[in-house]
Amino acid sequence: MAKEAVKYVWEGAIPLQIHLHKSDVASHPAPPPALVLAPRIGYLPLLIPLIKPYFKDSLPPGEDSIWFDYKGFPLKWYIPTGVLFDLLCAEPERPWNLTIHFRGYPCNILIPCEGEDSVKWNFVNSLKEAQYIINGNCKNVMNMSQSDQEDLWTSVMNGDLDAYTRLSPKLKMGTVEDEFSRKTSLSSPQSQQVVPETEVAGQVKTARIPVRLYVRSLNKDFENLEDVPEIDTWDDISYLNRPVEFLKEEGKCFTLRDAIKSLLPEFMGDRAQTSGEERSIDDTEEADGSREMGEIKLVRIQGIEMKLEIPFSWVVNNLMNPEFYLHISVLVKAPQR
């Protein structure tokens, strides 16, 4: 199952329907939208070499400053495409209709992007951050040869899991172990990576997990995901770049619930409202306390709506992104004030 999960992550793709913004159309009639499969672990700027030739005959002359939006909402290029989709489409939209712009870069909202070079820099920088969180330093990334670093990046760009699995053990990022993972191991490529015996001794059983948490908070409750309103501004999304301390207790499985509770304690207190717990309808005080605490409505990782009882070790070892960060998208009902 673990091998299938990692393969799912690497082969996962989102069908995109890319529309050229009307202000960039210099031909008549306007070109039809481009249809592209976007890798979940990839980034939107990496699609430009596929998309730009399609629209080239319709573009006005001049220098390009390419960016994407969803229903007028500028998309941050350094967030993986799959995370953007999970975060912005509560009810999955297929194909996902995006608009591409070749002018008018919104520098007040998006940091500049110089194409693949910027995306690669972001990836390597994230890799260094992850290793610092896990190992307390980033020397293995820094000491990686230039050719290995290039090959690692190429494996991510091309979605080549086999090449990535050969190269990533050199980073010695370690794996997460608890009683659950020891019993069910060891089918994950990231827990079965072939490492020379001289390197095994240096492998770390990490207790700190790099996590990027994206929290979208709604003031009004909803019954169905299609009722979730559109996002107007990035201010509606809280972003936490924070490690999870993986606590190992004998006889206890550290779950996704435990991890999220460490990140969002205001939504995961003893009286917080979560699914699967029995409550007395007559207990008004308990119900009021639940509303005051707010409610986690949805947790998504790699497009999967996660049950909070799943062992966190499985989630980390199988659903993390190639830069060794676990990206978690959360939809919450805000506490009543």
UniProtKB/Swiss-Prot annotation:
Feature: compositional bias, Basic and acidic residues: 276-290
GO biological process, one term: response to starvation
UniProtKB keywords: Autophagy, Cytoplasm, Isopeptide bond, Plant defense, Protein transport, Stress response, Transport, Ubl conjugation
Protein transport as UniProt keyword: yes
Cross-link Glycyl lysine isopeptide (Lys-Gly) (interchain with G-Cter in ATG12) residue location(s): K128
Annotated stretches, region: Disordered: 271-290
Disruption phenotype: Mutant plants are hypersensitive to nitrogen or carbon starvation. Early senescence phenotype. Hyper accumulation of salicylic acid (SA). Increased number of peroxisomes and accumulation of peroxisomal proteins.
Organism: Arabidopsis thaliana
Protein name in the entry: Autophagy protein 5
PTM field: Conjugated to ATG12; which is essential for autophagy. Conjugation with ATG12 involves ATG7 as an E1-like activating enzyme and ATG10 as an E2-like conjugating enzyme.
Gene3D superfamilies: 3.10.20.620, Autophagy protein Apg5, helix rich domain, Phosphatidylinositol 3-kinase Catalytic Subunit, Chain A, domain 1
Entry keyword Protein transport: yes
Assigned GO CC terms: cytoplasm
